Structures are given as C-alpha cells and as structure tokens.
Amino acid sequence: PKQKTYRASLVQPLIVKHHRLKVLGLRVGPLAYLTDFNAIDPEELAKVEGVKVLVIDALRTAKHLSHNNLAEALTLVEAIRPETTWLIHMSHEMGLHAQVDATLPAGVGLSWDGLVVEV
C-alpha cells in the first residue's frame, strides 16, 4: 500500500496480521491506529516510531488467536513509546473499565465510546 497526504498529514498504511490474514493499520501524522491484529513485522513497527498517540487493540487479558491481549499490547506500547496510548477493541472479558484502567501504566488508558483524541 502506498502512503498519501490528506489535509497536510501523511497517511501511511501499515500491514499487520489478524492471525494469518493481512489487515491494515494506519499512521496519520503523529497518530498510529492499530486494531484487530496480533502480529506486526519489525519493518512495519519501525514506521510507527515517534508517534505521539497510539490507538491499539487489546481484546482481553487471556491469549487470543487473532488479537492482542493486554500484555501483548503493553509490550508494543513499551517498544513504540508514544506519549499517550488508548486501548481499543476490548471485550467484556477484559474486566470493569475503572478497575482495569487503574492498573495501567502512566499514559495508557482504556478508550470508551465517544472518546475524542486530540493530536
């Protein structure tokens, strides 16, 4: 996939894997959006280096075939080192929002319907 410019922001597609299926994530300027996946190759991971905001899939705490669990998502957060991370695509198996949110590292939070992310 080719990168494009939209409203003065570089839009860069990122190939990630949903189990064996290739799916797209996006980097739009200082924001990376990576959802519905469980694997990313090092060369694709390098494309999100320096993002300020990361939006990333974290389905639940237990391992899953085609999605990141919480530990896997947090490992990627440590590698990418954004200023702010929003976890998305959570299931009911993640736990109660306030309880899980209280356990997350600084700069990482559970998202919610209606959240507006400023970049």
Question: Would you name each region that the model predicts?
Answer:
Residues 1-46, 113-119:
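Core dinuclear metal-dependent hydrolase active-site scaffold
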Residues 41-53, 58-119:
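Binuclear metal-ion centers of metallo-dependent hydrolases, dominated by the metallo-beta-lactamase
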